[in-house]
């Protein structure tokens, strides 16, 4: 684990809002040199705190109007890896988690329509032999969406 100080925290807060913020702009705002910002960012990259930068896509603008969560109960605990490999091949599955509680695996699935969601469930997910049952929860809204504060 890499210990971070208040300057690192400030840098991370800025970069999580806009990863394209120039180092010179941050340096001016924080009262340090651009070189200091560069060194700090590189140290956080090397330690794995900063994994990379990415484009954030608005799924709705691409027509993905249905977001749902699917709880999966497996027939056997030995089937986790096999099921995950199969789920990885479905483009609609955008996140998967191993969980405690009622479900073995919890998925986030994005589709264009309810009909497409039905198809994904009926012709893909529910045909996986190692799955005992599923429960689908359709998201109405996403009122809180944020990164953790460094």
From Swiss-Prot:
Keyword Metal-binding found: no
One matching Pfam family: AsnC_trans_reg
Family annotation (InterPro entries): ArsR-like_HTH, AsnC-type_HTH_dom, Dimeric_a/b-barrel, HTH-Siroheme_Decarb, Tscrpt_reg_AsnC-like, Tscrpt_reg_AsnC/Lrp_C, Tscrpt_reg_HTH_AsnC-type_CS, WH-like_DNA-bd_sf
Record-annotated HTH asnC-type domain positions: 4-65
Disulphide bond pairs: none
DNA-binding region: 23-42
UniProt keyword Transcription present: yes
Example of a GO MF term: sequence-specific DNA binding
Keywords for the protein's UniProt record, in alphabetical order: Activator, DNA-binding, Transcription, Transcription regulation
Primary role: Activator of asnA transcription.
Annotated PANTHER family: REGULATORY PROTEIN ASNC, TRANSCRIPTIONAL REGULATOR, ASNC FAMILY
NCBIfam families: PRK11179.1
Protein name per its UniProtKB record: Regulatory protein AsnC
Gene source species: Haemophilus influenzae (strain ATCC 51907 / DSM 11121 / KW20 / Rd)
């Amino acid at each position: 684990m890499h210990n971070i100080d208040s300057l690192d925290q400030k840098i991370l807060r800025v970069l999580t809002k806009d990863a394209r913020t120039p180092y010179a702009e941050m340096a001016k705002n924080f009262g340090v040199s651009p070189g200091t910002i560069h060194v700090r960012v590189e140290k956080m990259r090397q330690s794995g705190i900063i994994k990379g930068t990415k484009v954030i896509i608005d799924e709705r603008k691409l027509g993905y109007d249905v977001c749902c969560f699917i709880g999966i109960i497996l027939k056997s605990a030995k089937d986790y890896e096999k099921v995950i490999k199969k789920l990885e091949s479905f483009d609609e599955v955008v996140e998967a988690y191993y969980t405690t509680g009622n479900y073995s695996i919890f998925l986030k699935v994005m589709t264009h329509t309810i009909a497409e969601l039905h198809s994904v469930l009926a012709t893909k997910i529910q045909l996986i032999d190692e799955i005992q049952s599923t429960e689908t929860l359709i998201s109405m809204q996403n009122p809180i969406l944020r990164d953790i504060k460094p």
